[in-house]
A protein has these predicted regions:
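Conserved post-catalytic alpha-helical subdomain immediately downstream of the catalytic base
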Residues: 281-323
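Conserved phosphate/ATP/ADP-binding segment of small-molecule kinases
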Residues: 175-257
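Charged C-terminal helix
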Residues: 305-359
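Glycine/small-residue-rich loop that forms an oxyanion/phosphate-binding "nest" at active or ligand-binding sites
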Residues: 155, 159-184, 190
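Active-site cofactor/substrate anionic-group-binding motifs, chiefly glycine-
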Residues: 110-157
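Glycine-rich phosphate/adenosyl-contacting loop at the front of the ribokinase-like
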Residues: 41, 59, 70-116
């Protein structure tokens, strides 16, 4: 963009600021405003004035008026993690034996407490004492399937959140049939899966990659809006928040959606990363049952941020994916609500438009 065009665009941003017309704030609009202020206010002043308080005061006013206009809280995700650490919800995980230990540890790391019970005879008692249930379809057998259905009903009776992680649902007819039975008999607060798993739930089709997402279906900037629409339609159909995981995570209910960026490609080389996110999601939903969509976005953002940090350390120390797995749990243990708020990279969409952008 030429300087003249940038100046004109910034002038429009300043006019909107003065008239309090902003309903969207993005990094781009802020940069345009900064550029305009440089030309109009400071270009005619001594260079030293560029370092005075007037400049940041203008930006503080810009942000303050935006918050006043939209009425949105500055801290959206911070309080959700803080609630998990303060309330320490007890979460039952009916999960797979491949990732059970990691799921338990990351639940502890975020501040919640896990119970890894898949005993049908305990379902009623567990639903009384636990705050939420995570159902993971990773390793199945008929006994575990019966427990899933019974436990889900028990939690529904007590109005406690139930999470579905349909691992590899498109890999076999048995998995598809069980997923259909679960969705018929249980009201889920959130459903989490990669794009192939979510599409299989919607269409009833099969996938060729087992528990892994088909790379041809990956969420990208080009298809992001269409996948948001798909997630919102599925959310409307099921009444659940839909969390689609990938390079860009999508958390959606019937009217709003978060696009959460971050993470690292090495996370796909760690068995159980998706299962850990499912346990994390159950903990966030259990501690924040009235903010289901925000809880899903916060869980995804926390996992992405901790994954980035763990992978950076792996590269720095020339380590491997097993070390990265341990550091991922360590980073979750160390993560504060303030760090999550500052480090989260996301946009919030309403009616197809970005209303909050945090990068």
């Amino acid at each position: 963009m030429s300087q003249a065009l940038r100046r004109k665009s910034g002038e429009k941003s300043w006019e909107c600021l003065q008239n309090r017309k902003f309903n969207i704030i993005t990094r781009e609009s802020e940069n345009r405003l900064l550029h305009y202020l440089e030309f109009t206010h400071f270009v005619r002043q001594p260079v030293s004035c560029f370092l005075c308080n007037t400049y940041p005061q203008c930006i503080r006013r810009f942000r303050s008026l935006h918050r006043e206009k939209t009425g949105r809280k500055r801290y959206m995700l911070r309080e959700l993690l803080d609630n998990v650490r303060e309330k320490a919800p007890l979460i039952q995980n009916i999960t797979n034996y491949v990732a059970a230990n990691d799921c338990a540890n990351i639940t502890l790391a975020c501040g919640a407490s896990p119970i890894m019970s898949d005993c049908k005879e305990e379902a009623e008692d567990m639903s009384r004492i636990c705050w939420g249930l995570n159902i993971n379809m990773g390793t199945l057998n008929p006994r575990k399937a019966e427990t899933m259905v019974l436990a889900g009903r028990c939690y529904n009776e007590k109005n406690k959140p139930v999470i579905l992680d349909p691992v590899g649902v498109g890999a076999s007819g048995y998995r598809k049939a069980l997923a259909a039975e679960l969705m018929k008999n249980i009201k889920f607060q959130a459903i989490k899966g990669n794009i192939s798993e979510i599409r299989s739930l919607i269409t009833g089709g099969t996938g060729s990659r087992g528990v892994d997402a088909d790379q041809g279906e990956a969420v990208t900037e080009e298809n992001l809006k269409s996948y948001i629409e798909m997630a919102q339609d599925f959310a409307k159909e099921t009444g659940a928040v839909i969390l689609i995981t990938g390079a860009i995570d999508i958390a959606a209910d019937s009217s709003r959606a978060f696009a959460v960026r971050g993470g690292h490609e090495t996370m796909s080389r760690i068995t159980g990363c998706g299962c850990m996110l499912g346990s994390l999601l159950a903990a966030f939903e259990g501690a924040n049952p009235e903010k289901s969509l925000e809880a899903a976005a916060a869980a995804a953002a926390a996992m992405s941020l901790c994954g980035e940090r763990a992978c950076r350390r792996m590269v720095k120390e020339q380590a491997g994916n097993a070390s990265c797995r341990t550091w991922l749990i360590d980073e979750m243990y160390k993560l504060s609500g303030e760090e999550l708020e500052k480090g989260a990279d996301y946009e919030l969409y309403e009616k197809g438009h970005v209303v909050i952008c945090r990068h």
